């Protein structure tokens, strides 16, 4: 029997999944990517769909079609269609009241409806699934935004039919995401679920209630023009300016240079979700000039901070419209690749008073995941296992934390059946250590460096005590879905922190780990030097931006003495501009600048805080020893002061 698939037909990217071997598989395309750009291109010789279409857009802008989802099921006269058309490089014209797209294909003019373009993308996703499954696929569940009206839904269904698919059902994207997390199975009674979906081109917030498997959309809000591409634009503009400053040339008139820069910016943005800094290197970007630069997470967040903040308005609107207090939201689900950005996760979590959102399924895959589950249910292909059995029967590798000296201390031994839970008590390694860094590893080797790091987090605010006195309870908890929760709490203060780690793709195979360990030995010395440099750069940058924020903070701005304020502003601005022009300075140079800036800032800040009961100190510490840095907002520790793991 042929399988039914689930397709997330997105504005910028699409994704396909299938229920197989009692779990959902998200299927990679021929380029090895688990999401495929929703792009179709027409050339003199061929039609391209997906990655190949997106990759040649700079050379062929007028015949590369994207964002068809913004046109599907709408009238040409629709105000939104009119405003979108202004920004499209391809031609959209009125045909019988509907928007049609005109391109050149093999030397002649062709006209396509948005349904036809979407059907080409669906065909591509169908083929991706077929080459993986080794057979024909005829049925699919396709998702649409919750706010899509009947004509947009019908048009999407038609696109499916054109692509040769029997569309079993059109379901709402937020509903699919909730199904992916099995939220419809969690408990009895009504649950309020907020879905925060920040994709490549659009931002949607939905509030659903789920009761006994029935989903009801209570309210939706969002911004149809806010997404990852806007963050890329900010980076592109930033680097166009930097290129102007450094090389006195304006590359914005050259579409190919812009496209290459945009691709590099998109890659850098993705890297900064897991790293604190990244480099951009583009050979011969414009007029033969090589462009080498770097970008820190702090800078990226500053460039986009107004966009990031604006995501909370629709959240408030949805709660108002549904007449629900934020405390009554049972579950928050993050969807869309842009919710990988740590700052966004933090904004959402802080808005809900520290409540942790569900993000254990890859956010750009959650919708396709839920659609695949739904497709399996509709075709009765759940082979007597329900969704509760997306489970890992045993934990395949030991799981533990790093203790002093880089030792692997396992809490859950390999081949333990799951679900399971295990706790142990640990303590500090040095006197008066105010924080511990919990690093979670999987593997069988005695030293953590030979194992695979799954994630880490900091537990700060431990009261001063001799080494070995504080009691820190670390708990490992694996649920039936193979999702690992690790928490640490200080027995004295009750302070706690946690991390969720999912078991799925992205884990390394043993061979890869071995190979990486061997390579890492070689590069270790270079890495350490680079790490020290980056750390001191980040510390300085973080410090400078925090001072700048203090200067503009409404609560503090009027408390500064005017002369002091001017002096501090000049020092901060000169430091930031030096940083911009000194990507490759040495650790010592960064530290020297840090000292100079502290010499100006400390007396001024002390004066300011004298009335407020003392300056907040940087939270020092680190379990096996954190990297130097400084909690944003704290005064960094001096040379001999303790160091701290940088925490965002």
UniProtKB/Swiss-Prot annotation:
It comes from the Eukaryota. GO terms for molecular function: ATP binding; ATP-dependent protein folding chaperone. Residues 609-648 are annotated as: Disordered. GO terms for cellular component: cytoplasm. It is found in: Cytoplasm. Residues 611-636 have a biased composition (Gly residues). InterPro entries: ATPase_NBD (IPR043129), Heat_shock_70_CS (IPR018181), HSP70_C_sf (IPR029048), HSP70_peptide-bd_sf (IPR029047), Hsp_70_fam (IPR013126). The keyword Cytoplasm applies. SUPFAM superfamilies: Actin-like ATPase domain, Heat shock protein 70kD (HSP70), C-terminal subdomain, Heat shock protein 70kD (HSP70), peptide-binding domain. Keywords: ATP-binding, Chaperone, Cytoplasm, Nucleotide-binding, Stress response. Belongs to the heat shock protein 70 family. PANTHER family: HEAT SHOCK PROTEIN 70KDA (PTHR19375). This is Heat shock protein HSS1. It comes from Puccinia graminis.
